[in-house]
Amino acid sequence: MPFITIKTSGKALGPAEIQTLHQETTALMAEVMGKKAEVTAVLVEDAPASHWSVGGRALAGSGGVTAHADIKITQGTNTATEKAAMIAATRDMLLRVLPDLSTVAYVVIDEIPATDWSYGGLTQAERKRRADAA
């Protein structure tokens, strides 16, 4: 049940680009991280360039394009190799959608303890406990 937020700034994304980010991110989570596509959520948000700064300077007026992808997964469910591959693949995907992407763009994988987030009202720890008991 991964949740991925992709924030972009410096270029307004059209519906096709947003759909590409939704579909490709979901596919990468399945192929690279082994996550179920049907429970992978992706939120794409656009931040005004005046709200985003790099080096203390607002992106507005600089012509720069940047992004931040925050991938939330359950702690301990992926290896360091899988996470490194996902970070690289996500960066490549962002470059395909945003060819002028700055090097100052980030992909972060947050590992959330199974006791600290839920899907369908049950924590991941409780889901595992119930599955193990069945």
Q: Whereabouts are the PLM-identified features?
A:
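A domain-level signal for the structural core that forms small-molecule/cofactor-binding pockets
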Residues: 1-134
